[in-house]
């Protein structure tokens, strides 16, 4: 039984694609409703005001406004602060 595989044979050469996780919209950026703010595994960031959480823990905006990162009860949270429209 050979301990070396034949020529041009290898057991390596596989790798999984990256998951593209992380913060997609940073503090102060203006977002529209439905825009993804954070892609994450688990709840590193928790949803705050005007932010929803998807089945895979993705945080998304439920209303238009400005992204704001903060903390509440020792947890990192993400809020959307509505942008004041100038009265015409």
Curated annotation (Swiss-Prot):
Biological-process GO terms, alphabetical: translation
Chain segments carrying region Disordered: 1-21
Key words, A-Z: Ribonucleoprotein, Ribosomal protein
Coiled-coil intervals: none
Molecular function as annotated in GO: structural constituent of ribosome
Pfam families reported in the protein's UniProt record: Ribosomal_L27
Matching InterPro entries: Ribosomal_bL27, Ribosomal_bL27_CS
Entry keyword Amino-acid biosynthesis: no
Gene Ontology CC entries for this record: cytosolic large ribosomal subunit
Family the entry assigns: Belongs to the bacterial ribosomal protein bL27 family.
Protein's name in the database: Large ribosomal subunit protein bL27
Organism: Mycobacterium sp. (strain KMS)
